[in-house]
Amino acid sequence: MSETGLLNPASIRRIADQIGLRPTKTRGQNFVHDANTVRRIVSLAQVGAADRVIEVGPGLGSLTLGLLETGAEVVAIEIDEVLANQLPGTVAERMPGAAERLEVVLSDALDVKVIPGAEPTALVANLPYNVAVPVLLHMLAICPQWSTGVVMVQSEVADRLVAAPGSKIYGVPSAKLAWYAEAIRVGNVPPTVFWPVPNVDSGLVRITRRRPPHVDGRDPRVTRSQVFRVVDAAFASRRKMLRSALAGLCGGSMAASELITAAGIDPTARGEALDIGDLARVVEALAQAGALSDSGQV
């Protein structure tokens, strides 16, 4: 007897048994089996028939079906070939009218350079917990068209993503995400709605894209790559003053102190006290002095 609608615990286990799936921790495979949780995520994302949604790590299709239920198109990026091959069949069986609105991309999300088809408008995903931050930043970098999103991540990671300057947990993820977007925590998800049950709680983060800081008045030579190099250096040792943390980029702490002061920032401040706008101003001063090249990690 065929089933329709969203997945439940029984259908999750049935599909897993059919394809011989044994969830692995290395790929962060924990599948949501609670329809109320799925609909809650979709409701928070506020997507509908006008949207084309990126979903990273669709797994067995719980959230995919919830997104398709709204009338949205879904581009599902899945690294596991067995899961990627199964997903269209699951959608065709449980939500036949939505099958044509699903596109599956078999790939590691970090290897994706372009999202196929029409421009996406949103990112909604239960991100693999072991790579959640790099995947989120990568999707923001390669696809500037999407403007809103909701992601489910480990609770501790959710706290770090939304942390403000001055917080003990404010760091590289918080600062880099703030370059692209405003992020707020919008909910908690208990372990009991997953199979297998993880040993951590989960959190929901809503993302609203915005223009990078100082876009209008910024020196055009300043790039995201440069800003992220300074972010990495500023947080490499939380106890270091900024002049010491950036000494390697500036040719010494004295030169760093002069350049940081020129940016209107206290060189004795620590990275954890600075927002992304402050760090962008530091980069601008460094770039104007020729202290930075345009190389470095995104």
From Swiss-Prot:
Reaction(s) catalysed (UniProt annotation): adenosine(1518)/adenosine(1519) in 16S rRNA + 4 S-adenosyl-L-methionine = N(6)-dimethyladenosine(1518)/N(6)-dimethyladenosine(1519) in 16S rRNA + 4 S-adenosyl-L-homocysteine + 4 H(+)
InterPro entries in the record: KsgA/Erm, rRNA_Ade_diMease-like_C, rRNA_Ade_Mease_Trfase_CS, rRNA_Ade_methylase_Trfase_N, rRNA_adenine_dimethylase, SAM-dependent_MTases_sf
Pfam family, one: RrnaAD
Keyword set includes Nucleus: no
Highest taxon above the source species: Bacteria
One GO MF term: RNA binding
Keywords: Cytoplasm, Methyltransferase, RNA-binding, rRNA processing, S-adenosyl-L-methionine, Transferase
Primary location: cytoplasm
A Gene Ontology term for the protein's cellular component: cytosol
Subcellular location: Cytoplasm
Disulfide bonds: none
Class of this enzyme: transferase
Residues annotated to bind S-adenosyl-L-methionine: 30, 32, 57, 78, 108, 126
UniProt-listed Enzyme Commission number(s): 2.1.1.182
Alphabetical list of PROSITE patterns matching this protein: RRNA_A_DIMETH, SAM_RNA_A_N6_MT
Cited function: Specifically dimethylates two adjacent adenosines (A1518 and A1519) in the loop of a conserved hairpin near the 3'-end of 16S rRNA in the 30S particle. May play a critical role in biogenesis of 30S subunits.
Family under the similarity heading: Belongs to the class I-like SAM-binding methyltransferase superfamily. rRNA adenine N(6)-methyltransferase family. RsmA subfamily.
NCBIfam families, per the entry: ksgA
Name of protein: Ribosomal RNA small subunit methyltransferase A
